[in-house]
Amino acid sequence: MQGSIMCDISSVSSNKKDIINANTYLGIELGSTRIKGALINGQYQVIAEGSYKWENKLENGLWTYDLSDAWHGIQSVFSQISNQINKDYQLRLNNIGGIGISAMMHGYLAFDNRNKLLVPFRTWRNTNTHDAHRILSSELNLNIPERWSIAHLYQCALDEEEHVHNVAFFTTLSGYIHWKLTGKKVLGLSDASGMFPMDSNSLSWDENALNKIENLPEISNQPWNLKDILPTPLSAGEFAGRLTVDGASLLDPSGILNPGIPFVPPEGDAATGMVATNTLKPGTGNVSAGTSIFATVVLKSPLSKAHKELDIVMTPDGHLSAMSHANNFTTDLNAWVNLFAQFADAIRKPISMDLLYTSLFNSAVDNGTEYDAGGNINYCFSSGEFQAGLEEGRFVFARSPQAKLSLGNFMRAQLYGAFCPVTIGMNVLTKEEHVEIDSLLGHGGIFATPEVSQRIASAAFGVPVTTMPTASEGGSWGMAILASYIRRKNITLIDFLQNEVFAHVNSVTVFPRKDDVEGFQRYFEQFMRSLPIEHAAIATMP
């Protein structure tokens, strides 16, 4: 099982049989920078995949994506998969055993009773919802993060935006795509728990929270009831509709794909990360690192109280988990790597990006590199960061006169700085709530460089960090696995993953090193002390 599978001759016959018999499962995930798709066979191996780059943009002070670009990307991804099946197996991909859609969690997509989008898609990245976060968290005695969909809706009501009276339905990005493909207004448990608080017993919306919010004046004077405009939560493996005729045309304008294919509940990227890393059991957790970063730990028991640094969300099968989320991670890091690439081009010594990333990352753990990055500090904030108390962000690299500026120290400062914001919430979980974490599993592109990012992450969190062959391609594959779970009866999702999907998967574990852990702690303390630098940059740089 790997994220990028080149099928050998012996597997072609088996894969052909699976394609003909619709024993294949498709997962499509809309990430922050790429839309990716993975088609798996009956043995949970990827037999075709596709990807499409897209970018968020800042419009009228709010981060958004163009939904027409989302559909163009989805169609491109499916076309790549369909063409690969035709090329490799001389078959038309006209039927699939199950489909699942996943996407970035949270955000705000609101529609009127004619299914018209009322305002441009507002993503998880927006931090204009601080007042809503503060009021809702106080009213519910729960942490309602700025990213959550209910915070977006309530902020719109607080701001008296004209569209609020006309809301007939609101959802997340995965919920929207699923709705357009199937006609069903549903959402998987994990993605739902990033919209609005969930009841872990009923596996539905928290009725007490619904009643409290309904009684807030800004909501009580609306012509709608909150419960009526939310999607219906569904557990992993539940039937969530079929591909409609219109949906088939949206997904595959060529007309090859047949309607009627069953769908599983749409999910968020936290859920697909848990599935792709087999971290659904209490005491396990995963770190998903990309444009943003979040660490999710499945809880053995509820936390003692609400913490503003931690989201309480669900696994796709309904277990409570705690999430520390940071809005910023690789944007600044990628910009620095691109600068080195430009230098290589300037001296007419071009280098592949894979080799460049590997070389730069390895320098961060070279023998001559100081464990605390030698007095160099980096703030990777391209946007606001709740964990650090920032409503906006600026990129800042700073060093003391005594700092040793070497390539290794510079790169370690970059990597440490990227992990610092998420560590704020993780420290609350481990040091205040005393949650014991057995291990974390890393996934996302940054973990594609063998062991380096694991070593940095293990220094930040103080626990072993494991990666598997799917480390850099987890989301769409994880959603395809959830799609395949629709065929399984009388087996829990945890057992399905443990005993079938991951029964023979290799992994690499890096254990924390004392010098790294102590070095990161010194860096982290300086990072927190020097945050006024970031505030000054925000105040003085447009």
Briefly describe each language-model feature range.
Residues 1-119, 134, 166, 227, ...:
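N-terminal glycine/serine-rich phosphate-binding loop of ATP-dependent small-molecule kinases
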Residues 7, 12-20, 26-27, 93, ...:
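Active-site core segments that coordinate phosphate-bearing ligands/cofactors
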Residues 129:
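Gly/Ser-rich phosphate-binding catalytic loop and adjacent alpha/beta segment
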Residues 126:
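Carbohydrate-associated surface elements
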Residues 52-54, 123, 512:
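Active-site donor-binding loop signature of nucleotide-sugar glycosyltransferases
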Residues 85-123, 143-145, 178-199, 230-243:
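Short beta-strand-loop/turn "lid" adjacent to the catalytic site in phosphate-handling enzymes
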Residues 54-64, 136, 189-192, 224-230, ...:
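Gly-rich Lys/Arg/Thr-decorated short loops/hinges at beta-loop-alpha junctions or inter-strand turns
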